Swiss-Prot record:
Family: Belongs to the SecB family.
Organism the protein comes from: Pseudomonas putida (strain ATCC 47054 / DSM 6125 / CFBP 8728 / NCIMB 11950 / KT2440)
Pfam families attached to this UniProt entry: SecB
Protein name stated in the entry: Protein-export protein SecB
Location of this chain's protein in the cell: Cytoplasm
């Protein structure tokens, strides 16, 4: 019976593991260079969103994923505000093959972080006395597939730092 329990435990150790350890804000910034004059103008905003992800291997099977959302909102030709959040998470990921690990870090983890980043960004904008910023959901699987296609065409290999 002891041998069966030991063998069962060994089999479990080889099964894929995924666990969210921590979610945190790594960096947060807000600038409203034309305040307070911008509040007296007719509000006709144009929004530019820049999204980026980075991964870094930590000790053992732990990985940090950082999702950066940068938003620049202009009212006419003037910058109304610039807001940026770096939402990060520490994930325990083990026993995945290289393609699965790459997809998990490049799409699955950012998908978990996005609602937190979106909320932090929206809170920042409303605290600056601007209208709420309602960012649409992001298809990280599609973005990941596009990046893999780009890397394949360029002859690059996906890496985890």
């Amino acid at each position: 019976m002891t041998d069966q329990q030991t063998n069962g435990a060994a089999a479990e150790d080889n099964s894929p593991q995924f666990s969210l350890q921590r979610i945190y804000v790594r960096d947060l910034s807000f600038e409203a260079p034309k305040s307070p004059q911008i509040f007296r103008q007719t509000w006709e905003p144009s929004v530019a969103l820049d999204l980026n992800t980075k991964q870094k291997s930590l000790e053992g099977d732990f990985h940090e994923v950082v999702l950066t959302l940068s938003v620049t909102v202009k009212n006419g030709d003037e910058v109304a505000f610039i807001a940026e959040v770096q939402q990060a998470g520490i994930f325990l990921i083990a026993n995945l093959d290289a393609p699965s690990m790459s997809h998990t870090l490049g799409a699955f983890c950012p998908n978990i972080l996005f609602p937190y980043a979106r909320e932090a960004l929206d809170s920042l904008v409303t605290r600056g006395s601007f209208p709420a910023l309602m960012l649409s959901p992001v298809n990280f699987d599609a973005l990941y597939a596009q990046e893999m296609q780009r890397m394949q065409e360029a002859g690059e290999a996906p890496t985890v730092q």
